Each structure stands twice: as structure tokens, then as C-alpha cells.
Amino acid sequence: MSAPLLTLNNGVELPAVGLGVFQSSAQETADAVETALCIGYRHIDTAAAYGNEREVGQGIRRSGVPREDVFLETKIWASDYGHDETLHAFDKAIAKLDTDTIDLLILPQPMPAYFSRTVAAYQALAELYEAGRVRAIGVSNFTEELLDRLAEWTDTVPAVNQVELHPYFSQ
């Protein structure tokens, strides 16, 4: 299986098809990641809030696929928004995933009522990007208005705005 690649605004290539592990149990996650990589998947999507980052790392290692061939995406949960909190959450994520870098790091939701925390979290992502610790950064479920508000506070344009879209939830 070879998924088409999408080129992000910074030139990083993102496999268009990936495995998401939301609500997967620990053992199921490790097995699913290993199997997905063995059959050709190269994009794994997880998040701290899913509670299975450690098992994603295990599945990657067990697959035998070199880490540099896997596009690894994770998300900082809203409870970890804020500059220092986000940097700490990133350190926890890479320890659990057993990797030095993340390919795509996302803020999974805006917090309009506490937007200064969202901005501080995004600024921390931008620092991680500039330091080469993540290859691309982005947001999720931001409206056009919230993207404009974010742009007022940063020069780093999100590489993605991941939105939920399926037959039961259209936007």
C-alpha cells in the first residue's frame, strides 16, 4: 500500500492515509500500529489524551519499519495549553513515543474563552518547530476567525487545520 503524499506549506510530505488510534486499548493499539506499518501504512495519528502514546511507540518498534519512514503525529491536550505546559507535554510525549522528533504536532482544539493560553501553546509549538524538534505544526477544528486571531500573535502559519468530517458530522 502506498498512500498519496500531501505537501505541507513547509515542504514536509504527509501521507494522505493514516491510522488513528483514538479510543484504542493499549494492547489493541500496539498490535494495530505494528500491523498497519507492516502492510504499508506510514502515517500514525495519536494524542496524549488517547492514553496510548507509549503503545504507539511499541508498535512502531515492533514493526521493524525505520522511524524515519513513519510519519508520526500527536496532539497536545487543551489541559496542557500555555507555553511551559505545552513544552512539558511535548517532552512527555516524545518520552512515551520513544522518539526524538515528531513529524506533526497539533493543538486539537481552540479555547476561545481562554485564547491567550491557546496562543501561548501555539507559540511553544513554533519554538519546537524552529528548534527542529518537530517537522510541522498545526491546529485542529479552528474556524477562519480563530485562525485570523492566531495569525495576529505569530508569524508561523499552521501547516494544517485538521477538522472532523464524516457522514455523521458535516461542517
Spans of model-derived segments:
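N-terminal binding-site loop/beta-alpha segment at the start of enzyme catalytic domains
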Residues: 1-70, 120, 124
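A structural motif
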Residues: 41, 99-102, 134, 158
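Short, acidic/polar
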Residues: 24-37, 82-98, 118-120, 145-149, ...
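Active-site mouth loops of central-metabolism enzymes
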Residues: 14-28, 74-84, 112-116
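Conserved, mostly hydrophobic/aromatic
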Residues: 19, 36, 44, 56, ...
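Beta/alpha (TIM)-barrel catalytic core signal, keyed to glycine-rich beta->alpha loops juxtaposed to Asp/Glu
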Residues: 110-171
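A short, structured active-site edge motif that brings together acidic residues
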Residues: 67-80, 101-110, 162-165
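CE4/NodB-like, metal-dependent polysaccharide N-deacetylase domain
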Residues: 86-107, 127-131, 153
